[in-house]
């Protein structure tokens, strides 16, 4: 979902100021401080992370974000974990869409800011049920550009040979018990967009 980073930035700026201060004091990234506040396992909340419309596979600019299940005992930490869970659920939804098209993804390579968070990487593995790996070269865009350039000048016989430059670093494997817990939550999440679609589209004129 294209709101993944933006969603956590929204949380950081509106609800995570304490974690920002702690991160500054400890020399950490604010996101990692926020991730540390989350309890293991699914959040008690169900979040539709379409705070800026939805990305694939629905691609609906009129879809809106939603947080369901809040009570008087809900904490901002529950919301943070709900956001993280929802982004991972969107990833799983995309993977399942690709599988329906005959593309079976057996492992994931993560790059960018999200690839720097062990907590988030393990979460993605637990939710999707497949291994998630980081790369030895952190600047993946630069690596990809150099691979294409090398292919263009004949340094590689083709793109398949150039891919040999990609080396994995750390791999996060799914926790089966945690995966089963997320399966139950995902089954509820999977119908959330359709349930809220009509309401969200009516809000266009509000």
For the regions a language model picked out, list residue spans one by one.
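Active-site core segments that coordinate phosphate-bearing ligands/cofactors
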Residues: 1-111, 116-206
């Amino acid at each position: 979902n294209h709101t993944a980073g933006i969603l956590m930035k929204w949380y950081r700026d509106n609800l995570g100021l304490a974690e920002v201060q702690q991160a500054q004091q400890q020399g950490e990234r604010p996101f990692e401080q926020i991730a540390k506040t989350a309890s293991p396992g699914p959040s008690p909340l169900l979040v539709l992370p379409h705070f800026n419309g939805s990305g694939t596979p629905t691609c609906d600019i009129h879809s809106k974000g939603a947080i369901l299940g809040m009570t008087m005992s809900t904490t901002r930490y529950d919301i943070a974990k709900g956001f993280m869970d929802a982004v991972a659920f969107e990833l799983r939804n995309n993977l399942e869409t690709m599988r329906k098209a005959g593309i079976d993804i057996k492992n994931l390579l993560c790059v960018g800011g999200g690839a720097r968070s062990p907590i988030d990487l393990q979460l993605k593995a637990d939710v999707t049920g497949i291994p998630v790996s980081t790369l030895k070269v952190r600047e993946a865009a630069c690596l990809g550009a150099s691979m294409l350039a090398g292919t263009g000048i004949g340094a590689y016989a083709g793109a398949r040979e150039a891919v040999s430059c990609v080396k994995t670093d750390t791999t996060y494997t799914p926790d089966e018990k945690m995966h089963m817990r997320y399966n139950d939550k995902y089954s509820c999440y999977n119908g959330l967009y359709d349930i809220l679609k009509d309401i969200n589209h009516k809000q266009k004129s509000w």
